[in-house]
A protein has these predicted regions:
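Secretory targeting and sorting signals
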Residues: 1-18
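Metal-dependent polysaccharide deacetylase catalytic core of the NodB/CE4 family, i.e.
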Residues: 39-42, 99, 119-120, 125-128, ...
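Helical hinge/lid and interdomain linker segments adjacent to catalytic or ligand-binding clefts
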Residues: 42-134, 140-142
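Non-catalytic propeptide/linker segments at domain boundaries
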Residues: 190-269, 274-312, 319-320, 332-335
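Carbohydrate-binding surface patches
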Residues: 595-629
Length: 654
């Protein structure tokens, strides 16, 4: 394959070249190279249409990593692209979208880098000991040899190709279960074998074929490559691409990766509409939760913790409406009690769940006045105090996320989707009441564009009151008024079956298929690292038989999927901690925008972080007094004053 000089798009200002030609014509950085590299990745792609570019960017954005993108078809790659004027390497990880950076031109394929540019890149990797990870590549020796020979190749559709980690792969991807079967779908796959004359090590296999490899180069560079395509929407990407980046950076980067599962249940003490399999809805009396249902959920929660040790801290959040509570009830669990024993059983279970202020009577807060808004918030807190329910008053979830600029202009229309008028259309009297009562965090809804943060796992600072942060929830299709598998299945198919309101599936689904489809969506949230909670309702807690409920069926399914892939725990925070985490992410991304800089000094074993702007940034691979561990990884918040460097102990991964 001929090399051709093309270009690169990308990265930063240049200082004097730190790479130079040696007497034999090769490229070297040895004379100017230092033991220092920035905590920043370089994504090398062909152009904006490069299929691998969104996958790398999505992974890095989720982490909150610092990175640059070089588009090789339009901007030259020079030594100054890679090395600062003071000799510090600009990047601690080189991330290629493909091993050849090829694109079609004049009936053939050419590379975005010419021979000189490839040599400059390789010299930088060698002299600064920077690793290279390739999202997709194949066998062959051009532009360099990964020690792979062809076995077969072909497209994979929706039927998964099961791939397995080797012992070496399990060490690299140690956040995955060693026995995990990574499903490869919607992909083009090169099945390869490691040549017997090479020292390459298979990391991922499909049967006897290698589809992921660790391959040292002849000059000592470290390279890793997958031999199948992926995109940012596929589970295989969530499972593997972060691991490529983590390996390339040695676990030293700005940001962090964690996995969370949070579940809230709305309307405790309240009643719900009740949907029946024939499609009719009963509202009076509707569904009312019993003491047995409440006690049963406590047992199911404990059973799930025991069945799935990775979710050992799982605790449901109950968003309660205290207006229907019996304030004269005692404290007694009634495992087989009815509706009348719910409050006493709730008091008995006060420390079994987490409790969230959901307003006293669940009114829509879109146009309520100050006095009404204040009493709904404050009186519900008073009920919790009287019943002994621990509630943090800084968190508020309104009925149907009302008061935050999303509502139907016709107040009598409860069936059509609401209109998102934006957060500036929020009820100012409600906001004022919330502020005055010490509320800091308001639940939002990811279904509403105005509630979606601009950065991953962030919150939305309210434009009408910057002391308030909107932290969105994930909705689910486990319907708020369904209590049994038959009801949920009928409702789901009435929406998404071939004859539904929003046809999606070619045939109606069974209940097990509904749960599987819904937990595939939830699994994508978990595997991506999403912080946000999933929302359910009290009807989903009904014991429909043998202690089973719609919610715990959903939890059993999603935790089963997670546990089949991952070795690291799924984190479960209380709501104040969750909300504070989202606010800290806002601060982290503000630091990235301000130009925060981290530099790893290999000789000193330190990372030095500085920023032109005061604030806090999260650093992975850093050990401080506030550091936390997650699997084999460690990360820490680093608080910065403007222009004042902070040196911390580095803890790189192998």
């Amino acid at each position: 394959m001929p090399l051709r000089r093309t270009a690169l798009s990308g990265s930063g200002t240049a200082g004097p070249s730190a790479l130079s030609a040696t007497s034999d014509g090769s490229t070297s950085a040895t004379a100017a190279a230092t033991d220092k590299v920035a905590l920043r990745a370089l994504v090398v792609a062909v152009d904006d249409s490069d299929y691998g570019l969104p996958t790398w960017k999505s992974t890095l954005d989720r982490v909150g990593a610092a990175y640059d993108v070089l588009l090789t078809r339009s901007t030259p790659l020079t030594a100054d692209t890679l090395v600062r004027a003071d000799g510090v390497g600009r990047y601690d990880a080189i991330l290629l979208t493909s091993n050849g950076l090829l694109y079609a031109e004049n009936g053939g394929y050419v590379s975005g880098l010419d021979a000189d540019e490839w040599n400059v890149l390789w010299a930088y990797e060698r002299d600064y000991a920077v690793r290279q990870a390739v999202l997709y590549g194949s066998h062959g020796t051009w532009p360099e040899d990964y020690c792979l020979q062809a076995a077969s190749e072909g497209a994979i559709g929706a039927t998964p190709l099961k791939t397995a980690l080797t012992a070496a792969g399990a060490r690299v991807f140690d956040y995955l279960k060693p026995s995990a079967q990574v499903p490869v779908v919607e992909s083009y796959v090169y099945r390869t074998a490691v040549r017997p004359d090479c020292s390459a090590t298979p990391l991922l296999t499909a049967g006897n074929d290698t589809v992921g490899v660790l391959s040292p180069s002849a000059d000592g560079r470290e390279r890793m490559m997958l031999t199948f395509t992926s995109n940012q929407y596929l589970l295989q990407s969530d499972l593997l691409v972060y691991g490529l980046f983590r390996w390339a950076s040695r676990g030293l980067f700005l940001g962090e990766q964690r996995h969370y599962l949070h579940v809230d249940v709305d309307d405790w003490f309240n009643s719900a509409d009740h949907y029946y399999p024939d499609g009719h809805i009963e509202s009076d009396p509707g569904y009312q939760m019993s003491a047995h249902d409440a006690y049963n959920v406590s047992l199911r929660q404990q059973a799930l913790r025991q069945k799935y040790p990775l979710a050992g801290s799982l605790t449901l959040g109950m968003a309660y409406n205290g207006g229907d509570a019996n304030l004269r009830a005692g404290v007694r669990c009634s495992p087989y009690g009815g509706v009348g024993q719910l409050t006493a059983t709730t008091r008995c279970l006060a420390n079994t769940f987490r409790w969230i202020n959901h307003t006293l009577t669940h009114p829509e807060m879109n146009f309520t006045d100050y006095a009404t808004s204040r009493s709904e918030i404050a009186d519900n807190l008073a009920v919790a105090q009287r019943l002994g329910l621990p509630v943090d008053g800084s968190v508020l979830k309104t009925g149907e996320y009302s008061g935050l600029g999303v509502y139907n202009p016709d107040p009598n229309n409860d069936t059509d989707p609401p209109t998102d008028f934006g957060l500036t259309a929020s009820n100012p009297e409600f906001l004022r009441a919330a502020h005055d009562l010490g509320v800091k965090y308001l639940h939002g809804n990811m279904s509403f564009p105005s509630h979606r943060p601009v950065c991953f796992n962030c919150g939305v600072t309210h434009p009408l009151d910057t002391s308030l942060t909107v932290v969105p929830d994930w909705p689910t299709n486990i319907a708020y008024h369904c209590t049994t598998p038959a009801e949920e299945t009928a409702f789901y198919n009435s929406f998404y079956g071939p004859n539904g309101k929003f046809p999606y599936w070619p045939t109606n689904l069974t209940y097990n298929q509904v749960i599987s489809a819904e937990t595939d969506v939830a699994m994508s949230h978990l595997s991506s690292g999403s912080l946000y909670t999933h929302t359910f309702h009290i009807a989903n807690l009904r014991d429909y038989g043998s202690g089973r409920t719609l919610l715990t069926d959903w939890l059993d399914s999603v935790l089963g999927k997670y546990s089949s892939y991952y070795a690291v725990p799924v984190l479960n925070l209380d709501w104040p901690a969750l909300a504070k985490r989202s606010v800290s992410r806002n601060g982290h991304f503000a630091q990235l925008a301000a130009g925060v800089d981290g530099v790893f000094d290999r000789a000193a074993g330190t990372v030095t972080v500085s920023s032109p702007q005061a604030g806090t940034v999260t650093v992975s691979g850093a050990r401080t007094a506030d550091a936390t561990t997650y699997g084999s990884e460690v990360s820490a918040p680093v608080t910065l004053s403007a222009g004042q460097p902070v040196a911390i102990t580095a803890s790189p991964l192998p």
